[in-house]
Amino acid sequence: MEMWQKVLLSIVGGLFTILLVVWIAFQVSPRPGAFLINRLFAGKAEITEPTKFQAAQQQVVVTKDLAYPSTHQENQFDLYLPKAKAPVLLWIHGGGYVGGDKAGMVEFATRTAADAHVAVVAMNYQLAPDSQYPNQLQQVDELVHYLQRHATDFPQLDLTKIFIGGDSAGAQIALQYATVQTNPDYAKTLNLTPRITKELQGTLSYCGPVDLQQVAHEQSQDRFLKFFVKTVAWSLLGTKDWQHSAQLQQASVAQHVTASFPPTFITDAQNFSFQSQGEALVQKLTALQVPVTSLFFQEALNHEYQFDYALPEAQTCYQQTIAFLKEYQ
């Protein structure tokens, strides 16, 4: 055999070995895939409407990286305060449970604090797969408990009026926490005690997977979407057989809401998002006679469209969000 043939075989063999090791790594653990997805959500948040953002900055005091006691990591929150005491909007960021950060909420939180006169609490939580379900829910509870116990340290927070919302994965976490507050039997299954049954004024879901059980039955032909769903679910629930996990059904908000659920704002998009899940929750809440404001579009908008304020649809969403918060304060 010629020398060049031996070299070529060595290179091919080496590449095959590397590919085999990578393939095995993706089969035995969600971590490689979770790392790649996490990178998709990394990077500095882009300000999409600078003029209005800068105007809002003049009306809002921002304090970043405050800590709340937690048994988990990433236990920090940012506080966006208008000039006077205000109701609270607790916001939970998205990122597929494996990525994202509260820093990405800066434009939304600043403008919302100014325009709706609410104090926005933007929280972080430890990401999957390092922290698995329902730890993220527990961290929301830890933050709420901390704010209640230290109310005198935050005199500008009107903790008698609390909204809770989120985007993407954060919306599921937020609305599940609201379900805990309004369904005592459900709260017991999660070993949580309702803390804000009277204080909870409303919930907001931006492109949230609020009926998670649907993903177990979807037959998407999109390879990336299949990879994304499999990786996220495996990372969050801790099992490769996540489709048959009892926790998947438990985390499906639409299956556990009751007539005691608070007024809710729901929006979603068609592309790479969870519009059918949002529609399922709208249908359920409407049947329960819970006030619900929904915003869906025929246009092919992308997941998390609502934060791109250059889009007219995002501006409509923002205007309706402010109106919702003002109505139910």
Spans of model-derived segments:
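Alpha/beta-hydrolase superfamily serine-hydrolase fold, recognizing
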Residues: E2-Q329
